[in-house]
């Protein structure tokens, strides 16, 4: 039963971490001319008006993008400034934060004429919303399971590949399914850059994902976590957000650390960021 709809959480602190990482990775990949196939395994709607009933119900963007937006003129980090400038281009009225773009929007923004984009979405309502979005001709929406679709897609025709895997993890089995899909993808496309988002919840199921990746034989696995509050202070709900990057671009860790040093003070006194290599070369 598919129940997760990201509109309830659009623009939250996890989106900030996920999309800032995605933006930094794509920015690096675009330095080379060779074509890229981008894949988003769980695309969602693509664009989220913040005034909708769903988003207003929880208003999680108030602990995410909103404080960054309000302070954007004072933020000096180059990566963060470029990201917020790009975010401004998603607004119908410049300098007024009314919409938050999901990963399909960020990926579509990186597309060049010779690149490709595959957007998978299994939730029928979310896919219907996604189908209504205006996207470049190189973007193809696929109504189906993103992890299965990813395995069927590889190997790709382009020299390079960049994948975002961000399930809702409504089922515990998804943590291991992600490990399996990622390992299969890297067997077919060895130098693919893969980004995997995961939630930090009191049940700590994300440890299944991290230990599975560590035991998989995959090399060059880096991960970072953005915590809104300490784990012990959350008896329920997400207290933090994690991103795994496999085959990360050179300098990504330093870039994100510098950006996050300006992000965390805006998210509250308990907010902090940490990162390390899970598996080296």
Where are the language model's segments positioned?
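Class I S-adenosyl-L-methionine-dependent methyltransferase catalytic core
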Residues: 1-281
């Amino acid at each position: 039963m598919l129940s997760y709809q990201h509109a309830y959480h659009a623009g939250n602190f996890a989106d900030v971490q996920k999309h800032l990482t995605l933006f930094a990775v794509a920015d690096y990949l675009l330095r080379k001319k060779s074509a890229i196939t981008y894949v988003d395994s769980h695309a969602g709607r693509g664009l989220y008006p913040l005034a909708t009933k769903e988003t207003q119900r929880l208003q999680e963007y108030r602990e995410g993008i909103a404080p960054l937006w309000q302070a954007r003129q004072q933020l000096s980090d180059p990566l963060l400034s470029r990201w917020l400038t790009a975010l401004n281009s998603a607004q119908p009225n410049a300098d007024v934060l009314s919409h938050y773009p999901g990963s399909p929007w960020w990926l579509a923004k990186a597309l060049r004429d010779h690149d490709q984009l595959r957007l998978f979405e299994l939730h029928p309502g979310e896919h219907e919303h996604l189908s209504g979005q205006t996207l470049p001709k190189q973007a193809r929406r696929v109504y189906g399971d993103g992890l299965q679709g990813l395995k069927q897609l590889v190997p790709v025709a382009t020299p390079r590949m960049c994948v975002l895997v961000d399930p809702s993890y409504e089922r515990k089995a998804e943590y291991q399914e992600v490990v399996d899909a990622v390992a299969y993808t890297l067997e077919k496309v060895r130098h693919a850059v893969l980004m995997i988002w995961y939630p930090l919840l009191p049940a700590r199921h994300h440890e299944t994902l991290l230990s599975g990746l560590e035991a998989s034989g995959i090399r060059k696995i880096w991960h970072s976590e953005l915590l809104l509050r300490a784990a012990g202070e959350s008896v329920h709900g997400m207290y933090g957000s994690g991103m795994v990057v496999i085959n990360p671009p050179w300098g990504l860790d330093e870039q994100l650390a510098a950006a996050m040093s300006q992000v965390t003070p805006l998210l509250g006194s308990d907010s902090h960021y940490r990162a390390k290599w899970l598996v080296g070369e």
